From Swiss-Prot:
UniProt biased composition (Basic and acidic residues): 112-122, 367-384
Function recorded in the entry: Receptor component of the CCM signaling pathway which is a crucial regulator of heart and vessel formation and integrity. May act through the stabilization of endothelial cell junctions.
SUPFAM superfamilies: EGF/Laminin
Signal peptide: 1-27
PANTHER family: HEART DEVELOPMENT PROTEIN WITH EGF-LIKE DOMAINS 1, PROTEIN HEG HOMOLOG 1
Positions annotated as glycosylated: N125, N192, N200, N246, N333, N343, N535, N677, N699, N734, N750
Protein name (Swiss-Prot/TrEMBL): Protein HEG
Subunit structure: Interacts with CCM2 and KRIT1; KRIT1 markedly facilitates interaction with CCM2.
Source organism of this protein record: Danio rerio
Length: 977
């Protein structure tokens, strides 16, 4: 038994040692056997990263190398531009330019005049008939933007932001294209005066006029001014008796095509009368009307009139013939067909006293509309009265005509012979582009439709002198001559109408074709004489149109008209217009309004040649080459110079704005995109209107926030038209991305046709959504520990829960480390027993608390086991003696008991009787075996009742009697007999 107990004690000691080892393993100072291993490596993406590890655990700390990583993390390729305006140029709009997420935009053309200068050529077919029926027609194909027709009397001052047009004092028709606030105005003029190539005309002795004209070349719009000297001398003497007789009236009725939207028409009736004259239209007086064909065309690369159009006057006379003059464009040679949509009839009436003869010429013009253009067609017409207006001679073409009505000897100045009767002669300067004369015989009566232009002139007998250069005064014998001019200009929308009956026209006089090379004047001479109605004298022949080339720089075109009566003599002055002619030393470089582009001026050198004096932003022989201003680095530090047509712009990175043109400062930036879902009919002009409405919407939506600076618009192609928007606020503003979106969305939801910014939105289903500034700037946040957020208008790397940044501008986040926890942005220590990241681990609690408690419990269990084992060995005899409450039977039960006691210690002497008198003589404690004696005696005599260990069934003779003081010792055993 002792050996068994020893083994158990050793086992208990081993368990104690094991528990001690376990406790040391989980304790804080148990890492001495496992040294910490540290590994450091550098990554370009995340910076310097250090990893510390030991068996079973690993902790990582990341630090950013600002010296190398910052360049990549702050790389923001997107940009916003501001275009700097230069002197002499129209201001360029602000630009937005980015190179991330298709935010790159560029706006270099002026919004106002982008589509005002049409590239479409006007091609004319002119047909004139001088015999009965007398008619002239021409067809015009043109394209113009939406225009507004006004007269001088209706509009006293046209002011649109930075453009102001002076008021005209003569009867002129202004055709102006008026845009909204902040945009420019293109002004076209139709003038009925003696001043060719002018806009603002007035009859005076000498006047210097300025004609603004606009030109768009290479995306840049420049405003040029050209000064013309106009000298006009008109002497008038009026007799009250001839007020109703000597009156000139003109009526213009025009029908415009209404296929394009947004056309506005205003009608006025200006009237200019001399002395006490009144408006008279006498249709009962005999008339003599020379036919007049008025053509207009736009010239893209050659010189033009004050509104970039060339006006050509053509008068022909033939016997039952029509003169067709095809006008050939410098770029296109397209002849439009005549349609019944835009006609005009010109009727001249001349009062000759008692005569009742009259002749009428009609002019019909037809406008053929281009299907791909949707804007109002405009025909620049110039009416002729006693004082006529002619455009500058753009190309000098020598034309040889045979069989003419008027003959001039070669080398002599052309003269105008007098007719037999009272003659009304019109001298019209004519400038055409390579005219070709074609004769056709026709006797049909022409019926024209659409707009009608009627010019009625009532004058006495006229004697016209020869054209004189420069200032001319013509002495005529006139009695009580009165010059009264009354112009009535009416612009009406009418239905097609039929022209008046055209009487015959009679021509007479010497006829000779001539080309006067020595003449300095390009003229068209026409002689007419009246006859009684019904009697027509037809003379076959061709119209004579002499042209001449002249080397002088200026040519004076003199138109002199005299009126004759029978009583008095009046000296009538002449109106003189001096116009510069295009003369150049080299045939390829001539001086004209469009010779020098982009605001350049044509200057004549001392040698007689012409050259272009360009503005500082342009260069080249024709001022068409842009100067790269970015070579001189004009932009401040931090911005990028972008060269544009005629200027340059300084662009800051996206998220920055140019502050006072000096430096790029950081601003709050919010990105968004307007999407036009229905862009089927959206053309360039519609896109311009869409931009204007979006600007109004953004100004109304964003100006309510504090710190609002500006916004920029761009264009991005995709499914539908997409217009990116960059809205900028100052850093002091507390606006957020949600505020901007809600304000714009509210404006769109409240949109109706009563608002100014809504028609396009309702038509094209305009919508707005927010774009990510983080994606546009490619902000490099550490995706493992942070997320990019642009809610405040500034890209910010928002740390995940449990991480923090030492500086707000840092791109990476870090943790507090082991044993610390982030609380309100500060790192605090963990509670007892907790550690790890953000105090989420409790291994310390296990090592410090659980391990000792477990060891103590194990020790208690071991002690209890030892005690239990020892207690079991002591109580085993009870289980041997007593078993289920039954007595053990002695092997000597057959022997009778004796009640007698022998005094001898031997077995033979002891007797016991069974009677009751001697039964209790022996007590349980009276009989003892002598251990030595007993053992020796029993073993010697062979009477030992058992041979086994104590506790066997042979341990006692009489099982019913047992000594309770028996010890488990072989030397102390007692038997009962």
């Amino acid at each position: 038994m002792m050996e068994t107990c020893a083994r158990r004690v050793l086992f208990t000691a081993a368990l104690l040692v094991l528990s001690t080892v376990i406790a040391e393993t989980f304790s804080t100072d148990s890492d001495t056997d496992n040294p910490l291993s540290t590994e450091t490596f550098y990554s370009r993406a995340s910076g310097l990263k250090q990893t510390s590890s030991w068996p079973g655990r690993e902790a990582t700390a990341t630090a950013v190398d600002l010296s190398s990583g910052l360049g990549e993390m702050t790389e923001i390729p997107a940009s916003v531009s501001i275009t700097a305006a230069r002197e002499g140029h129209s201001p360029k709009p602000l630009q937005t330019s980015t190179n991330a997420a298709d935010w790159k935009t560029s706006t270099t053309s002026d919004e106002t005049t982008e589509h005002l200068q049409s590239d479409t050529e006007l091609t004319h077919n002119a047909t004139a008939q001088w015999e009965s029926p007398s008619s002239a027609s021409h067809s015009i194909t043109s394209h113009h933007p939406v225009t507004e027709t006004r007269t001088v009397r209706d509009v006293t001052d046209l002011i649109d932001m930075d453009t102001t047009d002076s008021v005209s004092h003569t009867d002129s028709t202004y055709i102006s294209t008026t845009n909204r606030v902040g945009e420019r105005t293109l002004l076209s003029v139709i003038s009925n005066s003696t001043f060719a190539y002018t806009q603002n005309s007035s009859i005076s002795d000498a006047e210097s006029q300025t004609s603004p004209w606009e030109e768009k070349t290479s995306g840049a719009t420049q405003v040029n001014e050209e000064t013309e000297e106009t000298v006009s001398t008109v002497s008038e003497q009026t007799d009250p008796t001839f007020e109703g007789r000597n009156t000139t009236s003109a009526t213009l009725e025009t029908e415009r095509s209404t296929l394009s939207q947004g056309t506005e028409s205003q009608t006025g009736q200006p009237s200019v009368t001399g002395q006490t004259a009144k408006e008279v239209t006498d249709i009962d007086n005999p008339n003599s009307t020379p036919p007049l064909t008025v053509t207009s065309r736009d010239v893209e690369e050659t010189d033009a009139t004050s509104v970039s159009s060339e006006t050509s006057y053509t008068q022909t006379s033939s016997d039952s013939a029509s003169s067709i003059l095809p006008f050939t464009s410098s770029e296109h040679n397209v002849t439009s067909t005549s349609q019944e949509s835009h006609n005009s009839t010109l009727i001249y009436s001349t009062n000759t006293g008692g005569s009742t003869e009259f002749s009428t010429g009609s002019v019909s013009s037809t406008a053929h509309e281009e299907t791909e253009r949707s804007s109002t067609r405009i025909v620049d017409e110039t009416t002729l009265h006693d004082v006529t207006s002619a455009p500058p001679v753009l190309e000098d073409v020598a034309t040889t005509i045979d069989d003419s009505l008027s003959k001039f000897p070669s080398g002599q100045s052309p003269t105008i012979p007098k007719t037999d009767d009272q003659t009304n002669t019109q001298v019209v300067p004519t400038s055409t582009h390579r005219p070709q004369v074609t004769d056709e015989a026709t006797d049909e009566v022409s019926t024209v439709y659409s707009s009608t232009t009627t010019l009625t002139t009532t004058t006495p007998s006229v004697t016209t002198r020869q054209l004189q250069p420069h200032y001319t005064t013509v002495q005529t014998q006139t009695q009580h001559t009165t010059i009264v001019t009354t112009d009535i200009i009416q612009v009406l929308r009418t239905t097609p109408s039929t022209a008046h009956h055209v009487p015959t026209l009679t021509t007479s006089g010497p006829q000779a074709p001539s080309t006067a090379d020595s003449s300095d004047v390009t003229t068209l001479h026409l002689e007419t004489s009246t006859a009684t109605p019904g009697n027509t004298t037809a003379h076959g022949g061709r119209a004579t149109t002499p042209f001449s080339k002249s080397s002088p720089g200026r040519t004076t075109v003199v138109v002199t008209t005299g009126h004759l009566t029978d009583k008095s003599t009046t000296e009538t002055g002449s109106a003189t217009t001096q116009m510069p002619l295009r003369t150049s030393a080299s045939p390829g470089h001539v001086c004209g309004p469009k010779t020098c582009a982009n605001g350049g001026h044509c200057v004549r050198s001392a040698e007689g040649s012409y050259y272009c004096q360009c503005l500082s932003a342009w260069t080249g022989p024709f001022c068409t080459e842009d100067v790269d201003e970015c070579v001189n680095s004009p932009c401040p530090q931090g911005s990028v110079c972008v060269n544009t047509g005629g200027s340059f712009s300084c662009e800051c990175d996206l998220g920055f704005d140019l502050e006072d043109g000096r430096s790029c400062t950081q601003v709050k930036t919010f990105l968004g995109t307007f999407t036009v879902n229905n862009s089927l009919h959206l053309r360039n002009l519609g896109l311009h209107e869409l931009h204007r409405e979006i600007q109004q919407l953004l100004n109304a939506s964003l100006s309510i926030f504090h710190g609002y600076r500006r916004f920029t618009l761009g264009k991005r192609d995709g499914q539908g038209v997409q217009i990116p928007v960059v809205s900028m606020f100052s850093l002091s503003s507390n606006v957020t991305s949600a505020d901007v979106f809600n304000s714009i969305q509210m404006s769109l939801n409240n949109c109706s046709r009563t608002y100014s910014h809504c028609p396009i939105k309702l038509q094209h289903q305009l919508s707005y959504h927010v774009e990510s500034l983080c994606m546009a700037q490619k902000t490099k946040c550490d995706v493992q520990y942070s997320d990019c957020s642009d809610i405040s208008g500034i890209p910010n790397c928002q740390c995940l829960p449990g991480y923090f940044k030492r500086n707000p501008e840092d791109m990476t986040c870090r943790d507090c480390g082991d044993g610390l926890k982030l609380v309100n942005g500060k790192c605090v220590e963990c509670m007892f027993g907790f550690g790890g990241f953000n105090c989420n681990n409790f291994y310390k609690l296990i090592a410090v608390v659980v391990s000792p408690a477990g060891g103590a419990l194990l020790l208690i269990v071991v002690i209890a086991l030892i005690v239990t084992c020892c207690k079991k060995d002591k109580n085993d005899i009870n289980k041997i003696i007593f078993k289920s409450g039954e007595l053990q039977m002695s092997p000597y039960a057959e022997f009778p008991k004796s009640n007698r006691v022998s005094m001898e210690w031997g077995r033979e002497t002891i007797e016991m009787q069974e009677n009751g008198s001697t039964k209790n003589l022996l007590q349980m404690t009276d009989i003892y075996y002598s251990p030595a004696l007993r053992n020796s005696d029993l073993e010697r005599n062979g009477l030992y009742p058992f041979s086994g260990l104590p506790g066997s069934r042979h341990s006692c003779i009489y099982p019913a009697q047992w000594n309770p003081s028996f010890l488990s010792d072989d030397s102390r055993r007692r038997d009962y007999f």
